[in-house]
Amino acid sequence: MSEPLKPRIDFAEPLKEEPTSAFKAQQTFSEAESRTFAPAAIDERPEDEGAAEAAVDAALRPKRSLWRKMVMGGLALFGASVVGQGVQWTMNAWQTQDWVALGGCAAGALIVGAGVGSVVTEWRRLWRLRQRAHERDEARELLHSHSVGKGRAFCEKLAQQAGIDQSHPALQRWYAAIHETQNDREIVGLYANLVQPVLDAQARREISRFAAESTLMIAVSPLALVDMAFIAWRNLRLINRIATLYGIELGYYSRLRLFRLVLLNIAFAGASELVREVGMDWMSQDLAARLSTRAAQGIGAGLLTARLGIKAMELCRPLPWIDNDKPRLGDFRRQLIGQLKETLQKSKSSPEK
């Protein structure tokens, strides 16, 4: 008799929905679970990467200014004048039977021919470096295209440029996976997942080796001048190795241009990531207290070499990065720290023995 009366329900009116709470249920984590908690990964500065890509594209495209055209026209006119004067000297020497002058003309012709040949070779290698950027843009378009007929020829051209033989197991798996009903996006995606990782794995090994050598060299070397020369030499060697792996033959000017583009890309997008990666380890593992100053400098030099290799890999790679296949600086960071700590432990244990 003490229960309250329930409200009246009128069936002629629509039922009222009970309001649901907007709050989620409470979750309680144990102490063991809280230790293994890992924060979610955050995308790495899309704005900075976009600015870096725009700067690289602008640097790759030749600037067609008026002064450039005037200089090129003047050089062409000077070259034509030199050739004409050389032909006239040769004719006069032949008519007067001046064999000494004729020999000098022949030697000059050989020197000019060698110079023209080297200029043409350098221009062709520089054009090949620029062409790689256009191939990357074409691959990006094919990865978002539903057309048919271009993907297979494009991928076969990339395999030929990289020196991958037709009997290579990765290329054979790609041939077995594609069929006529697939569009260009699917064919290029299969190439990126089956064939391209073969070259990427070789480039990663080269980056790891060169970064480890830079780290150990800086950690044990007492001379700053020797350190600078060694790092510069090894970084240039690393760029040459990565370019060769991806089928790009570098000349003098193309090597300088690629090195400039890599440094430009690092200046745009690499500084904040490098500081974050180094700071993460120093704060979490207290490396500043465990390692010496030279060892810390070695880790910094190794990370810079790894960053240089990653950007050179990105510029020489014929395909854009897909999903999460881009190498992370943190992967090389952990490897460098482990190798350096192992080397320091061996050096400390050897005098005791």
Swiss-Prot record:
UniProt main location, coarse: membrane
A Pfam family the protein falls into: DUF697
Membrane topology category: Multi-pass membrane protein
Stretches of the chain found on the membrane's Cytoplasmic side: 91-99, 234-353
Key words of the record: Cell inner membrane, Cell membrane, Membrane, Transmembrane, Transmembrane helix
PANTHER family recorded: UPF0283 MEMBRANE PROTEIN YCJF (PTHR39342:SF1)
Name used for this protein in its record: UPF0283 membrane protein YcjF
Organism name: Salmonella typhimurium (strain LT2 / SGSC1412 / ATCC 700720)
Taxonomic path: Bacteria, Pseudomonadati, Pseudomonadota, Gammaproteobacteria, Enterobacterales
Protein's gene: ycjF
